[in-house]
Amino acid sequence: MDPSNRPQPFKRHLGAPVHPLPRDLPPTGAPAAVTLSGRVPPSDPTIDGELLARLLFYSAGVTRTAGDDLWFRAAASAGNLHPLEVYAVVGEVAGLDAGLYHFAPEVFGLEALAAGDHRPALADATVDPDVAASPLALVVTGLPWRTAWKYAERGWRHVYWDAGTMLANLLAVAEGHGLPVRVRLGFVDAAVSRLLGVDGVTEFPVAVVTCGRPTATAAAEPVELPPPQFPPTPLSPAPVDFPLVIRVQQAGELTTGDDVTGWRAAAVAGLPRATDTVDAPVAAGSEPIESVILRRGSTRRMRRQLAPAELLHWAMAAATRQVPADAIPTGTTLLSHEVAVHAVHGTEPGLYQQVDGPPQLRRPAPELKVRTLSQGLCVDQPLGGDSAYTDFACADLDQVLDGYGERGYRVAQFEAGVAAGRLQLAAFTLGHGGTGLTFCDQDVSDAFGTRAACMLAIAIGLPAYRPKPGGPPGRPRRLTR
């Protein structure tokens, strides 16, 4: 972790013209509790520059700073490293010409990389005509060196965690405005990389997200469009390649359209159930989803006090809702949740499992004993034990890999990231807090007596301080160190 070789937090393209995005984005979405419960009916709003700006800012925008070298984004990220970039494939967005754009969060603008309608080519790569017929697609890419600089090979997992967490925000904002969205995790990797002008190794595609309802008539057949010609800025003085990261990423790649079709049609038997909607808590208030996103920040200190029941039951229900992704069959999830409950009103301390419904007690234990266990499972980080409860999102990897092949591991990590992002938003909706934590992989499985492997750990509880909300586009809140 050489400070002189630290990766740049933002990618730019030299010479690319920048289109400023609207900065006046008052919170106008539905109440956060209703949104996170999936209770906002779709209204299919017209996508214009303001709605696009809203989607980008509240998922990947800069909301806080601490000096000129430390930036915080709207979504959580392991180590605050944010190994992701977002590209916009614009077809029918009011006020923007069709083309390929790159989101530059530090200036809150779109870099215009290539003109023309790239949706047909993206639809070809995803083997999905709805991509060509949707007004907008956002493509999320991962830059493993940005997180491997600190976490080495383990950082590859962080790319998919962080993508899920970021898209939890995007899904919430879209739902809060009645905008239909769908995530594609199946695509020809090399074709999407080529369209974006990235090499597929130091930067690779992670997810394709269509926004808006597809029109009845799809765009034209793919035509050969020139790739972006603007060179990217260097990521760091001497980026380091990790051979294991490259091998793991390439092991899950799909190389043909037939591969994508077959992978997407894979049947995985016995997946847990997931619902699309849950009941919203009555006392949660009417705070818009955007305001909650601005208040959210990784909680650094928690009080060991009794938490209200809805912080466990509603927050976990909201977090485990169906994810609208091609790889996850409707009404199912790849995850189970092993939950260490410490202090929640009406819930006995102990180890619980949440799968196919509310959490079920597996092993009761004294509060202090559970707190000590949770802290140990989280590499002795105090927040793991100071929380009201700590959720360990797990996946049966034998089941996942049998059905999805090597690419299935990406899907499980991604879905865990979505659940983690939703869980934190739900906690902040109720006026509480949460944070992601590192964990000891095998120890989690052993402690809960499960064959499933831990994908991600999230501590949820009562903050010991009042967090300061982030600022609007172009005016991030400045924090003191």
Summary of predicted features, one role per range:
Residues 427:
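Short surface loop/edge beta-strand patches of beta-sandwich-type extracellular domains
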